[in-house]
Regions:
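Aromatic-lined carbohydrate-binding/catalytic grooves of carbohydrate-active enzymes
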Residues: 171-210
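Aromatic-lined carbohydrate-recognition surfaces of secreted/lumenal glycan-active proteins
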Residues: 227-234, 292-299, 329-335, 343-397, ...
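Substrate-binding cleft of secreted/luminal carbohydrate-active enzymes
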Residues: 401-514
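Catalytic domains of carbohydrate-active enzymes, especially glycoside hydrolases
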Residues: 160-187, 285-290, 404-412, 480-488
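Active-site-adjacent "subsite" loops/lids of carbohydrate-active enzymes
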Residues: 139-148, 229-286, 335, 339-347
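Short solvent-exposed coil/turn linkers within tandem alpha-helical repeat scaffolds
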Residues: 27, 57-66, 93-109
Length: 514
C-alpha cells in the first residue's frame, strides 16, 4: 500500500511538473516567431519554417499575423515542390481569409502548383531562390525601361518641354519618371502656374494642387512614343497639414532622451491612410503607365513611436516599443549625429514589423490606384543597403528587398548613387562603382528578371553640382550591365548630360556584338 501511495505521488509529480518545465522554455511572441520563420523560409529550411507558422496559427488566433502565416505555409510547400499540399494550404487561406492581403498571390501559387501537377517539367529546386519569384504572374512580362527621372525641367512652356522629350526619345530613353509632388523650398517647374508652395501636380481634394499639369505632360510624352510614371511621395505627402500634429510621425531624440514630432506622416493613423488612398485613387485616373513610390516610404531606426504605432505593435507583440528595449550604447559622433553600437533582438522584431506595415501600406495604395486603371505598374525606391545587407536595410530604413519581393512590385528601383556612397562611406570612385555592380548582381539574383531591376544611376554630384563625366558614366554602366540587361534610370535628369553619347552602352545590340 505504501509503495502504491509513493508511486501515485510520483506520477502526480511527473504529470504536474511536465507542463511547468515546458512552460519554462523560451516562447517567442507572434512577431518574433514570424520573423524567425521567415528567416528559415529564405534559408530554404521550409519544414522548420512551417512549424513556426503553424504555432502562430494555432496559439495566437487573434493576431494579424495568422493570415500571413497561413499563406506562408502554402508558399513553403510550393518551394519544397509539394504541390498538392501547397494547393490545399493556399485554398485554405482563400477560404478562411476572403478579404486577405495575399489573395492574388495565393491564387497565382495555386495556378503554378496545378500546372506542375499536370506534368509540366518542374524546375530544379534551389534553396536560395525564394518561391515569391515563382508566384509572380507568368503571363505578365515587364518591359526593360531606360528612364530619365525628372525632378526639374527648365522649359518655360509646354513647347519647350516637348523639345526636351523629343531629345530624350532620340537618345534612347523610353520612359519618363515625372515628379508630381512639390516640396516647399524646392524648385518649381517653370512651365506651370503655381497656386501653392507645396502640393501635387494633379487634380485631387487630398492635397493642395500646385497646378493640374500631369495630363498635359502625359499627352506630350505619349505623342512622342514614350511612357510616363508619376513619381509621388507617401510619408512626406503631408502638404497643408502642419496644424495636425496627430498625423505626424514620432521619433526618439537620443540627446534629450524624449519623443518628439518627426518629419512626415504617421502611417499608422487611419485618417492618414484614407488621405493617401484618396491621393492615389485620383492619381490613378490619369493616363499614365505607372507610379514610382518616392524614397520616403521608410521609417528610420528611431521612428515611429506614435500612439497608433505603439498600440498596433503592442497588439501583435504583447509589449510596447521603448527606446530602452532597443538601442545598445547610443553615442554622439564627431559630426554631431547619434549612432548606436548595436540593436537588441526586440529592436529587430520592431524594425521587421515596421517593414511589413510599410509594405502593406504600399499594397493598399497600389490596389486603390488600380481601381480606375488595372494596368498600372508600380516601382518602389529602395536604398542599396536594403539589397546588400538585410540587417542594415531593416534597421536603418525598415526596408528590405526580400520584403518588397513579397508584394510583387513591377520594378525594384535601386538607388545606386555611387557619388553619394563615396561621401557617406569615405571611399574612392572605383570602390563605389564596384559596390554598385555588386548591388546589381545581388538584385538580379534575388528578383530573377533583370528588366524588373531598375538601377538608378546618379548623374549629378549633389554637393559640387558637377555633371557626371562621360567616362565615369560609362564605367558605372559597364559594371552594372555586366550582370544583365537591367532597366536604368538616370537621376536627376539634367539637359547637359550626354545621353546621346551613351545610348549604345545600354542597347542589347551593342552588348551582343562585343
Amino acid at each position: 500500500m505504501k509503495k502504491r501511495t509513493v508511486g501515485l505521488l510520483l506520477l502526480i509529480f511527473i504529470l504536474s511538473a511536465s507542463p511547468q518545465s515546458y512552460g519554462q522554455e523560451k516562447l517567442l511572441n507572434p512577431g518574433e516567431l514570424y520573423d524567425s520563420s521567415m528567416e528559415l523560409y529564405y534559408k530554404g529550411r521550409c519544414e522548420e519554417a512551417i512549424q513556426g507558422f503553424l504555432k502562430i496559427v494555432q496559439s495566437t488566433p487573434a493576431s494579424k499575423l495568422v493570415s500571413y502565416s497561413q499563406y506562408m505555409i502554402g508558399l513553403c510547400y510550393l518551394k519544397m515542390e509539394k504541390h498538392e499540399e501547397a494547393i490545399q494550404q493556399l485554398e485554405l487561406y482563400l477560404k478562411t481569409y476572403p478579404e486577405g492581403d495575399r489573395i492574388k498571390e495565393a491564387e497565382q501559387g495555386i495556378q503554378i502548383a496545378k500546372e506542375q501537377l499536370r506534368g509540366k517539367p518542374s524546375p530544379q529546386p534551389t534553396v536560395s531562390k525564394p518561391v515569391v519569384k515563382k508566384s509572380l504572374p507568368e503571363e505578365k512580362k515587364v518591359k526593360r525601361r531606360i528612364c530619365a527621372q525628372v525632378s526639374y525641367l527648365g522649359g518655360k512652356n509646354l513647347e519647350e518641354v516637348e523639345k526636351r522629350v523629343k531629345e530624350l526619345k532620340n537618345a534612347g530613353v523610353n520612359t519618363i519618371l515625372f515628379r508630381v509632388f512639390q516640396n516647399k523650398g524646392d524648385r518649381v517647374y517653370k512651365f506651370v502656374t503655381a497656386h501653392h508652395e507645396e502640393g501635387v501636380y494633379f487634380k485631387t481634394e487630398y492635397a493642395p494642387v500646385v497646378d493640374d499639369i500631369l495630363g498635359k505632360v502625359a499627352e506630350i510624352v505619349h505623342r512622342n512614343g514614350l511612357e510616363i510614371f508619376a513619381w509621388i511621395t507617401t510619408r512626406y505627402a503631408n502638404y497643408g497639414l502642419e496644424g495636425h500634429p496627430e498625423y505626424r510621425c514620432k521619433k526618439y531624440n537620443f540627446e534629450t532622451k524624449k519623443m518628439e514630432l518627426a518629419r512626415g506622416f504617421n502611417l499608422f493613423h487611419p485618417e492618414v491612410l484614407k488621405r493617401l488612398e484618396g491621393l492615389f485613387r485620383d492619381l490613378g485616373r490619369y493616363p499614365i503607365e505607372g507610379i514610382l513610390f518616392q524614397d520616403d516610404l521608410i521609417l528610420r531606426h528611431n521612428e515611429d513611436f506614435s500612439a497608433e504605432a505603439n498600440k498596433a505593435f503592442l497588439k501583435d507583440f504583447g509589449y510596447s516599443p521603448h527606446a530602452d528595449l532597443f538601442y545598445i550604447d547610443p553615442y554622439k559622433s564627431d559630426s554631431g549625429k547619434y549612432y548606436t553600437k548595436g540593436y537588441t533582438d526586440r529592436f529587430m522584431s520592431w524594425a521587421n514589423w515596421k517593414n511589413r506595415w510599410l509594405m502593406n501600406v504600399a499594397k493598399r495604395l497600389m490596389e486603390t490606384a488600380r481601381e480606375s486603371n488595372p494596368n498600372l505598374q508600380f516601382a518602389i525606391n529602395l536604398y542599396f543597403e536594403a539589397v546588400i545587407n538585410n540587417l542594415n536595410g531593416v534597421a536603418w530604413f525598415s526596408q528590405t528587398l526580400s520584403g518588397a519581393l513579397e508584394n510583387n512590385f513591377d520594378y525594384y528601383a535601386i538607388m545606386a548613387y555611387h557619388r553619394q556612397a563615396m561621401k557617406d562611406r569615405n571611399i574612392e570612385a572605383k570602390e563605389a562603382i564596384d559596390l554598385m555592380a555588386e548591388v546589381a548582381q545581388k538584385a538580379v539574383k534575388s528578383v530573377g528578371d533583370p528588366s524588373k531591376v531598375l538601377m538608378k544611376v546618379q548623374i549629378l554630384d549633389w554637393k559640387s553640382y558637377e555633371v557626371l563625366p562621360q567616362k565615369e558614366a560609362e564605367e558605372i554602366l559597364a559594371g552594372i550591365l555586366n550582370h544583365g540587361e537591367v532597366s536604368l534610370a538616370f537621376f536627376p535628369y539634367i539637359e547637359q548630360f550626354p545621353f546621346h553619347s551613351l545610348k549604345e552602352k545600354w542597347t542589347p545590340s551593342k552588348k551582343s556584338s562585343e
